[in-house]
Design a protein with these regions (language model features):
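A short, flexible beta-alpha/helix-coil linker loop
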Residues: 52-55, 165-167
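Substrate-binding/active-site clefts of carbohydrate-active enzymes
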Residues: 1-41, 59-60, 67-71, 77, ...
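Conserved structural-core and active-site-/substrate-pathway-adjacent residues in large, well-folded domains
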Residues: 38, 48-49, 164
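A conditional alpha-helix N-cap/helix-loop micro-motif detector
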Residues: 24-28, 64, 138, 174-175
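Short, solvent-exposed loop/turn segments at secondary-structure boundaries
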Residues: 58-62, 171-173
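Conserved alpha/beta catalytic core and glycan-binding cleft of carbohydrate-active enzymes
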Residues: 72-206
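Hydrophobic residues within beta-strands of alpha/beta enzymes
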Residues: 46-48, 194
Length: 206
């Protein structure tokens, strides 16, 4: 595992190095080196898995925010067309930390789960977008608008059709249900993300 440091190290645990220790600083420098390597070869940007979790024992994400703001500053300076996308699932926090956009993903239950999942469904294949009409869009809409108003015009909220952690849109849905859900994802403000295979209606399992 890579050690980006601990915001509040426990002195009883010597492996918990502060973010200013030589090891974590070297890891950050290497991260930027790797990003430059791929950007020089034509990468359009980076999608960061669990972006909020790099620095440990960091209440309020103060040190985590600084890490990403430093990276955003490097991108703005050297690769201004590159996109920095987070799986933070809290657009207010992620965009405040310097990301261009954040997924309204499964971590953020108030937005994602009521729309695309239902309690008790092991595949997570239903939610508001199902023909039974037993979902409720009001609560996720209110939460979405809270994040939208707080982040405009600094960044974007992104809906995704699926990812490696959750079921495909096709799991347990009929074609009309998929069409309505995909139309929502593609027409909401922000930047939509289509999981590979969903563009051709790939069924589960894949």
């Amino acid at each position: 595992a890579l050690n980006y440091g601990f915001a509040k190290p426990d002195p009883r645990a010597p492996w918990q190095q502060p973010v200013t220790a030589p090891g974590p600083l070297a890891v950050r420098a290497e991260l930027q080196h790797i990003m430059r390597y791929w950007l020089e070869r034509g990468a359009a940007g980076f999608r960061v898995d669990m972006a909020h979790s790099l620095i440990k024992n960091d209440p309020g994400f103060r040190k985590t925010n600084k890490l990403w703001r430093d990276i955003r500053a490097m991108l703005d300076r050297e690769y201004p067309d590159a996109a920095l996308v987070s799986e933070w699932s809290s657009p207010i926090d992620a965009i405040g930390a310097g990301f261009h956009m954040d997924f309204a993903a499964q971590f953020n239950a108030p937005i994602f789960n009521p729309l695309f999942r239902a309690p008790g469904d092991a595949w997570g294949s239903h939610g508001y977008f199902n023909a039974r009409g037993d979902g409720d869009a009001l609560a996720p809409l209110e939460e979405y608008l809270r994040h939208y108003r707080a982040t405009q015009p600094r960044g974007y909220i992104s809906f995704q059709s699926a990812n490696h952690d959750m079921a495909r849109m096709s799991g347990g849905r009929t074609l009309p249900e998929i069409e309505v859900a995909m139309a929502f994802i593609l027409t909401m403000p922000g930047v939509p993300f289509i999981y590979y295979g969903d563009e051709i209606g790939l069924r589960m399992p894949d």
